[in-house]
Amino acid sequence: MSNIIKQLEQEQLKQNIPSFRPGDTLEVKVWVVEGAKKRLQAFEGVVIAIRNRGLHSAFTLRKVSNGTGVERVFQTHSPAIDSISVKRKGAVRKAKLYYLRERSGKSARIKERLGA
């Protein structure tokens, strides 16, 4: 039974996901259904958390929109996600960047990771 579940999960994993780490800035394009219309919506933000659980993996992006912090959790292998692109690589020393929630302005900036 367990092997069947693992095989089904393996088939549903997306293969075209770029490698990213906390602190990186990503642009995620998501399919949004509004009534009868279906369109792509882009969300660009800093990765503040990653949860690696196979098919149930997720990551959290944070951006500041009109002075208000917006966080959105995406399921990594969701069929609603059209594409993920890395815009900028950030140099941080923690896996979870929840401290960015209390910061604003210059103190919320993340240095750019060079070389890698």
From Swiss-Prot:
Coiled coil (UniProt feature): none
Pfam families, per the entry: Ribosomal_L19
One GO MF term: structural constituent of ribosome
GO BP: translation
Highest taxon of source: Bacteria
Keywords: Ribonucleoprotein, Ribosomal protein
InterPro entries: Ribosomal_bL19, Ribosomal_bL19_CS, Ribosomal_bL19_sf, Translation_prot_SH3-like_sf
NCBIfam families recorded: rplS_bact
PANTHER family to which the protein is assigned, alphabetical: LARGE RIBOSOMAL SUBUNIT PROTEIN BL19M (PTHR15680:SF9), RIBOSOMAL PROTEIN L19 (PTHR15680)
Family, similarity comment: Belongs to the bacterial ribosomal protein bL19 family.
Protein function: This protein is located at the 30S-50S ribosomal subunit interface and may play a role in the structure and function of the aminoacyl-tRNA binding site.
Stated name of the protein: Large ribosomal subunit protein bL19
